């Protein structure tokens, strides 16, 4: 599943091709993805793209008339192609530009979304979201206040979009490993020093992943078709039964909140 670094990589990749260009057409080949694709998207035809923003794992293509909101779901991807390139299987939406380029959305599982938002109106999917992890708003003081007296396990806590957005399964496991915190630790029991370290590691892991172009496991490739290289940096995720790169202990795996979770029992001891 594309997570924050993959979505940010997509944003960085499409921005030079879209910003300042005029939308000539929006071609919808599948009328429903995760939700029905709204007819209001056609209001963007003839509009100039002002900016491409990201909020959590949503991309917003902004025009003076309104915005297209895109979520990549489990297997979605965006490619910038020449308009004459024929569509392929699972190519569900084209945003056609007057410069002869097309932003093409491919999604085999159809769990993604294309939505529409009027200017100045916050779409409901963007409400109740926590701060962006790479902003100053997400800091140890904020984390400590949110975690106070909570019995939730720390991995589920940092994956809660109401607490902080964009810390998906891969990066939650990696951040906890780097902070040497067991994923099943009660978040309310964390010491101030652990919180400070965890916040710093979340930021560092995400920043590194963005620089590497995200993580390619099954479905994600960059806009230019190249893989993301953060998979080469993974310490625990997807490495069950392999040796820890730091201490040579065996990496453990267990489902936490229905998500596969990985950790090193030596580097991340579980203190009940």
Swiss-Prot record:
Its cofactor is Zn(2+). The active site is at 2 (schiff-base intermediate with dna), 3 (proton donor), 57 (proton donor), 259 (proton donor). Keywords: DNA damage, DNA repair, DNA-binding, Glycosidase, Hydrolase, Lyase, Metal-binding, Multifunctional enzyme, Zinc, Zinc-finger. DNA binds at residues 90, 109, 150. A zinc finger (FPG-type) spans 235-269. The keyword Zinc applies. Coiled coil: none annotated. It catalyses: Hydrolysis of DNA containing ring-opened 7-methylguanine residues, releasing 2,6-diamino-4-hydroxy-5-(N-methyl)formamidopyrimidine; 2'-deoxyribonucleotide-(2'-deoxyribose 5'-phosphate)-2'-deoxyribonucleotide-DNA = a 3'-end 2'-deoxyribonucleotide-(2,3-dehydro-2,3-deoxyribose 5'-phosphate)-DNA + a 5'-end 5'-phospho-2'-deoxyribonucleoside-DNA + H(+). The keyword Lyase applies. Involved in base excision repair of DNA damaged by oxidation or by mutagenic agents. Acts as a DNA glycosylase that recognizes and removes damaged bases. Has a preference for oxidized purines, such as 7,8-dihydro-8-oxoguanine (8-oxoG). Has AP (apurinic/apyrimidinic) lyase activity and introduces nicks in the DNA strand. Cleaves the DNA backbone by beta-delta elimination to generate a single-strand break at the site of the removed base with both 3'- and 5'-phosphates. PANTHER family: FORMAMIDOPYRIMIDINE-DNA GLYCOSYLASE (PTHR22993:SF9). This is Formamidopyrimidine-DNA glycosylase.
């Amino acid at each position: 599943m594309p997570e924050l670094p993959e979505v940010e990589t997509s944003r960085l990749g499409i921005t030079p091709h879209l910003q300042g260009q005029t939308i000539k057409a929006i071609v919808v080949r599948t009328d429903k993805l995760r939700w029905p694709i709204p007819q209001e998207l056609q209001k963007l035809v003839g509009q100039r793209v002002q900016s491409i923003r990201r909020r959590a794992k949503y991309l917003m293509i902004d025009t003076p008339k309104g915005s297209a909101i895109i979520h990549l779901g489990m297997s979605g991807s965006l490619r910038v192609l020449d308009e004459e390139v024929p569509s392929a299987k699972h190519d569900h939406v084209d945003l056609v530009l007057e410069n002869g380029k097309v932003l093409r959305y491919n999604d085999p599982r159809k769990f993604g979304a294309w939505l529409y938002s009027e200017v100045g109106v916050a779409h409901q999917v963007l409400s109740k979201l926590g701060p962006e992890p790479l902003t100053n708003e997400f800091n140890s003081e904020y984390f400590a206040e949110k975690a106070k007296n909570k019995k939730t396990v720390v991995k589920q806590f940092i994956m809660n979009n109401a607490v902080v957005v964009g810390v998906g399964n891969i990066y939650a496991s990696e951040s906890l490993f780097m902070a040497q915190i067991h994923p099943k630790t009660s978040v309310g029991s964390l010491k101030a020093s652990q919180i400070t370290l965890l916040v710093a590691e979340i930021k560092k892991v995400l920043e590194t992943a963005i620089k590497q172009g995200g993580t390619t496991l099954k479905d994600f490739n960059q806009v230019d078709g190249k893989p993301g290289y953060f998979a080469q940096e993974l310490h625990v995720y997807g490495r069950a039964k392999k040796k820890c790169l730091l201490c040579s202990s065996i990496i453990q795996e267990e489902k936490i909140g229905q998500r596969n979770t990985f950790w090193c029992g030596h580097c991340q001891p579980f203190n009940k």
